[in-house]
């Protein structure tokens, strides 16, 4: 799972395009329970257009919905639950 995403992010040069070092994966996809969607956490907001580009690339290539959240925009209680199964995919 994590390796698939990492290879995908490297292939599409996502880390450089978004100017980020890592992308968090959480939820059911991170736990390997089912693959109904992919939840991604970004440490900083790359802007609307870049978020939408990432979302469309993930959805097109994995054929499932993708949700993207920004870490500093989450309520602390939500971040607590996100952190329980958060895995980071590192790009550089």
Short names for language-model regions:
Residues 1-25, 30-35, 43-92:
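Catalytic core of pol beta-like nucleotidyltransferases
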